[in-house]
């Protein structure tokens, strides 16, 4: 009777660690979902990142100070630049710190920083259509003048709501800043006044909405915070971990499953982590305690838990079977 028992034991143990295909398979994740390295030697101060919905697996970035108003399309598979876009119709950029994509594949670029320590009475946002063909080209942009309701601010974080197209800015303040809300639609005539709404307790260097607009993440140099959008009644949910260093950029992958966090410098890495909470375009991700929490219920955590539970059940079954065979 030993051979049947051994066969049954093997079958039970195999079954214990078997998981559904949906749990073991990541599916067709967008390129860049595991992170990548920006290899273009022209990109040494990547200060913003935006995942393209028009070209899945492509990520738009820019330097905070460059030789001109340039955007770079980076392939998330190779880390190579596949297109450089020059903006026409705008003045000389001062300190370009952020980029986001709104409805209709409209790219918004935030020239909102103060790299030179100057308190500007106004800053600029540029809007342009995302090119349908990825090649080096010049695209005409619209330039918007931006002012803050409570005076000049230094800022590096700009968000564009993926459903409404409304633009938000978070000022950079060591003691924490605020989320500033822009007009429902930006105007190219006159100043667009941004008003403070909820406080953001972080020295923010970038921020991004999830693809469904249900949450947004704010990152700094030493940590991050994520918020539930909650239909505009914003709720702070918890902290997220970030890679240490000159961290300047953040975006969600287009499937809403990963949060990508980038750095400045030559050959700058972009690291991926599960989205916090259960927001994002396709749900999933870790719990509210943060992206890298050891107790998170990301896809890997679920798989391990399923296997562990199965192992316990299998061992219990084996003990029962052994007793049964002994009786025979």
For each feature predicted by the language model, list its residue ranges.
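Sequence/structural signature of beta-propeller domains
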Residues: 2-15, 20-328
């Amino acid at each position: 009777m030993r051979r049947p028992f051994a066969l049954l034991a093997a079958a039970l143990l195999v079954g214990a660690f078997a998981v559904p295909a949906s749990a073991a398979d990541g599916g067709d994740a967008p390129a860049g979902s595991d992170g990548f390295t920006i290899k273009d030697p022209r990109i040494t101060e990547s200060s913003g990142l935006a995942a393209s919905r028009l070209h899945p697996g492509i990520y738009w970035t820019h330097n905070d100070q460059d030789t001109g108003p340039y955007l770079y399309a980076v392939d998330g598979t190779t880390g190579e630049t596949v297109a450089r876009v020059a903006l026409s119709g705008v003045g000389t950029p001062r300190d370009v710190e952020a980029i986001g994509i709104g409805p209709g594949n409209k790219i918004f670029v935030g020239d909102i920083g103060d790299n030179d320590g100057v308190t500007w009475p106004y800053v600029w946002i540029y809007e342009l259509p995302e090119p349908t063909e990825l090649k080096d080209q010049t695209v005409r942009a619209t330039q918007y003048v931006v002012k803050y309701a409570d005076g000049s601010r230094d800022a590096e974080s700009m968000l564009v709501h993926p459903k409404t197209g409304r633009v938000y800015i978070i000022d950079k303040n060591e003691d924490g800043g605020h989320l500033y809300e822009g007009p429902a639609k930006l105007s190219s005539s006159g100043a667009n006044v941004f008003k403070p709404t909820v406080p953001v307790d972080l020295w923010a260097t970038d921020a991004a909405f999830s693809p469904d607009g249900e949450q947004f993440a704010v990152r700094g140099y030493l940590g991050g915070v994520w918020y539930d959008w909650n239909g505009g009644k914003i709720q702070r949910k918890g902290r997220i971990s970030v890679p240490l260093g000159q961290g300047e950029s953040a975006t969600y992958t287009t499937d809403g499953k990963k949060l990508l966090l980038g750095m400045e410098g030559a050959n700058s890495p972009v690291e991926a982590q599960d989205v916090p909470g259960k927001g994002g375009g396709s749900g999933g991700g870790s719990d509210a305690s943060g992206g890298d929490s050891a107790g998170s219920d990301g896809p890997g955590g679920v798989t391990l838990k399923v296997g562990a539970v199965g192992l316990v059940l299998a061992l219990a079954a084996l003990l029962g079977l052994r007793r049964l065979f002994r009786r025979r």
